[in-house]
Every structure is written in C-alpha cells, then in structure tokens.
A protein has these predicted regions:
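N-terminal glycine-rich, Lys/His-bearing helix-loop that initiates the first secondary-structure elements
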Residues: 1-43
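Short, hydrophobic/aliphatic alpha-helical segments
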Residues: 4-8, 59-63, 186-188, 192
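Conserved PLP-enzyme active-site core in the AAT-like
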Residues: 10, 69-198
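Active-site C-terminal subdomain of aminotransferase-like
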Residues: 18, 38-40, 49-50, 189-198
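Short, basic and Ser/Thr-rich N-terminal targeting/leader segments
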Residues: 21-22, 66, 115
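Conserved N-terminal alpha-helix of the aminotransferase class I/II PLP-enzyme fold
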Residues: 31-81, 103-110
C-alpha cells in the first residue's frame, strides 16, 4: 500500500505500452481514430466525452478519495449539476446548507425549484436540524464542509447517521482528500472543484 503523497503523484496512471512515458501525456486531440463504425480504440471517440489524460485524472481522484470511480467535468458547477440531475427528479426534496457555495445555492433555488424539486435550507452544523428536515421524499442531503466562503464545518459522520434513505453528497472542494475522506464518514457521492486545492 502506498502513501497519500505517492498516490497524489502516481495514482491513476499507467504508462502506455508503446512509448512508456513516465509522466501523464497531455492529449490535445479533440477526436480519435476508429477502427470502424462504433469500434473505438481504447474507448475514446471525442475528448469532450473523455481522453487518456482525463481518464488518468479521474483514476487519480478516485484513488485519493478511496472511491470506486470518478468522473471529471469541465467545471465544479457542471459536476454539481450532473450529480443533482442524476439523484433528483420532479417531486423530490433536497436538504441544503444555509451557507452553501452561492453557485450551488442558486442552482438549487433557481433551476431545481423550477424543475419541481423542493428544498429545505438548514444549519448543517446541527445534525438534529438536518434530521428534522428529512422528509419522505428527501433524496439528497447536500453538505459542503468546510463551506465556501464562510468555512463552516459540518460533522459528515453525524449527518450520515441521520440521512435515512437520502443520498449524502459532500462538496469536498476546500478540504480535499488530503484533509478529509467523506466516503469513510458515510458519504455516498463526493464532488470537487479543481480550482481550489486539487
């Protein structure tokens, strides 16, 4: 088993067998040749969907978080939007922190509310308030800890204990996997923006 520092440098990358570069190459190609119709080489077709550089990043983040897999998007807000769209549908309910990142808060209030998703805003530093906010149709509890920009700290493990049937999603942007491992504390999904500490 390797340590965090070694994983931070090497996790997720295997040198290709043709040239064996030590560092992860940056693939600048937007498209990849196919051997025939729908016969992708290495599973890559178009960089917007993925390429070997992005795959190495995804594998590294998954390894650092102790996750089975990771998916990289063009921005942290894109990752948040996708996570919520996968987990929520009209008629569902989300519990969100009263000091969540403004972009996340606006996405929930302005987009998901119009989509028919209800929300309850609570103080995530109070697990009892979180427990009281969970409803029969609650599908997501959104935790950001430390929060951006107020640096509020939520007890992920205590919230996991009261989440009931809801998915616990943790925005781990400020702490990074070096300081906090949400999956080990009961999170179901972890998101990051790589504009901070990753």
């Amino acid at each position: 088993m390797t340590g965090f520092a070694t994983d931070a440098i090497h996790a997720g990358y295997e040198p290709d067998s043709l040239y064996g570069p030590i560092n992860t190459p940056i693939y600048a190609s937007t498209t990849f040749a196919q051997d025939g119709l729908a016969q992708l080489r290495g599973g890559y077709e178009y960089t917007r969907v993925g390429n070997p550089t992005v795959t190495a990043l995804e594998n590294a983040v998954a390894a650092l978080e102790g996750a089975e897999y990771a998916v990289a998007y063009s921005s942290g807000m894109a990752a948040i939007d996708v996570a919520l769209r996968v987990l929520l549908k009209p008629g569902d309910h989300i519990v969100v922190s009263n000091d969540a990142y403004g972009g996340t808060y606006r996405l929930i209030q302005q987009v998901f509310t119009q989509w028919g998703v209800d929300n309850t805003v609570v103080d995530m530093t109070d697990p009892e308030a979180v427990a009281a906010a969970v409803q029969d149709n609650t599908k997501v509890i959104w935790v950001e800890t430390p929060t951006n920009p107020m640096l509020g700290i939520a007890d992920i493990e205590a919230i996991a204990a009261v989440k009931q049937h809801a998915a616990l999603v943790v925005d781990n942007t400020f702490a990074s996997p070096y300081l906090q491992k949400p999956f080990e504390l009961g999170a179901d999904v972890v998101v990051h923006s790589t504009t901070k500490y990753i």
